[in-house]
Amino acid sequence: MTNIRKTHPLIKIVNHSFIDLPTPSNISAWWNFGSLLGLCLAIQILTGLFLAMHYTSDTMTAFSSVTHICRDVNYGWLIRYMHANGASMFFICLFLHVGRGLYYGSYTYFETWNIGVILLFAVMATAFMGYVLPWGQMSFWGATVITNLLSAIPYIGTTLVEWIWGGFSVDKATLTRFFAFHFILPFIIAALVMVHLLFLHETGSNNPSGLISDSDKIPFHPYFTIKDILGVLLLILALMILVLFSPDLLGDPDNYTPANPLNTPPHIKPEWYFLFAYAILRSIPNKLGGVLALVFSILILMLFPLLHMSKQRSMIFRPLSQCMFWILVADLFTLTWIGGQPVEYPFIIIGQLASVLYFSIILLIMPATSLIENKLLKW
């Protein structure tokens, strides 16, 4: 009798995706982040579901409903902080996952990579709308500032902003629709993840060498299930340390003040994971230019397959490209730091230099470095 795992229509799909999947034997811990992102998404959907049971999306009661969750609901404080800090863990895993893709040339799988970039946009949109829901000062002013950026779009900008707001300012209609979108988007993300995996399994996984590994594949289970469980335990450990010891470490104190349209906080800034893009936005004095730079700072990831000039796929044997990659990482850290600083000297000029360097490295320096390495290979 054949195994049900290999014959049952539903279980067969799971088997081909997570059990009998042929996997390169040499993939390192950098390949753990896909499964960790799946775990993060599951944690966010579950904690979010329980939060939604007690949350009210009304401007009069939103802030107090979050307070009620933390004070009166059984383990409400735990659920709330797991959700808030779970978002941070989600983005840490996302950035490492994307960084791995860039370093090892995984972007040469066009469909998988482009769906991944769309997923990144979807997660960023979800996180932004989620930050608005507690209706604190930073929630309100963050929503006002970021949605207002759309007014830079010629001709339709102002109408578009008022349409998104559902009025002439960020108010009850805005909060209600943001809650609705924040609830539905994770399920759309989950569907996109399925498509992401579908395209990945069409080609098989990349590996650190960047070479074809068809001759050396091993089953996903038990080898990589065990490896993933280690990653899962470390992620949960990190998340729980954050939640139980310093839950407000990554938050903004201003968000513990209820939203007040008449009082602007001294420094309006988004959550830490958006600061690099926010720094790029602020470094351009023109509103439309800033918005375009902001969008392009993420959209530029889609150009990586076109900008790949090297004869080798991975950076593992390319020391010059490695050097440029780590300069890019350092530049992103610099942008993140600048995004959280006030708009004054010397932060303005540092932000502008870091922004120019960011686009220069990706569009010019890395392709040029690859061409130089190709020449060196001939020697």
UniProtKB/Swiss-Prot annotation:
Keyword Nuclease: no
GO CC aspect terms: mitochondrial inner membrane; respiratory chain complex III
SUPFAM superfamilies: a domain/subunit of cytochrome bc1 complex (Ubiquinol-cytochrome c reductase), Transmembrane di-heme cytochromes
InterPro entries (alphabetical): Cyt_b/b6_C, Cyt_b/b6_C_sf, Cyt_b/b6_N, Cytb/b6-like_sf, Cytochrome_b, Cytochrome_b_C_euk/bac, Cytochrome_b_N_euk/bac, Di-haem_cyt_TM
Other information: Heme 1 (or BL or b562) is low-potential and absorbs at about 562 nm, and heme 2 (or BH or b566) is high-potential and absorbs at about 566 nm.
Membership in a protein family: Belongs to the cytochrome b family.
Cofactor(s) this protein cannot do without: heme b
GO biological process: mitochondrial electron transport, ubiquinol to cytochrome c
Name of the protein in question: Cytochrome b
